[in-house]
Amino acid sequence: EVNTAYIDFHNEDLLYTTKSGIIFRVKISDKKLSLSPVKSNLSEYLLKKFEEKNASINYYNPYSVSKFGIKDIHIDDNYIYASYIEDFGSNLYNTSVIKAEIKDSLIFKKLFSPKNYISSKMKEFSPIQSGGRIRNFKNDSLLLTIGEYRDRSAAQSLKSVNGKIISINKKNGGYRIVSLGHRNPQGLDYYNEEDYYVSTEHGPFGGDEINFNINTAGQK
């Protein structure tokens, strides 16, 4: 992944966010695009120091390889939500969500932060498999995918959010598991009228999946 970026619509414009936490507003008019930087504190949530095994990663070189950083953005009701890999110290990581009201400057605050972590000392640790896709869900909540970082046992454990799709309350960050047994779900969409969601994920060597959850009754 070379400095991946994410976009979503806000009114008639786009907000364009790089994996390194730089945000631009993109105005579309007369077949021309104009970009203007948006001041924010987003980069403050991202890793500034790296362990030796990841020493080649440099967020401030746009051509460097980055396995951490922002994983998705989602805009709804004048708020922007961003998922990212949070550093909990002592070589522990997991996927978290922050939010900001959309104003001239974006001040992000923590919305959801897991209580379990994945250690980078694990032999097969892979931050690429972190999920992070965000979509609207019902009852004033979001859907978030969280990968298992190649800790395969976590996907079936109800004590871990890894290898799961969870719903998160937009106001207080409370969450519940709505689907488990995933590897690295990255595609996600919810269909409100029919009340079901679809997720996709990569298999290790082929074997990609499309999963339908058609019974979300009682899930919030």
What are these regions (language model features)?
Residues G174-Y175, G218-K220:
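Acidic/polar loop patches that form or flank catalytic/metal-binding clefts of enzymes
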Residues F205-D208, F212-Q219:
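Short edge-strand/loop segments of extracellular domains
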Residues Y93-S105, Q156-K171, F212-N215:
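Beta-propeller blade signature
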Residues E1-R152, G187-Y190, E194-G203:
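Acidic, Gly/Ser/Thr-rich repeat motifs that build Ca2+-stabilized beta-propeller blades
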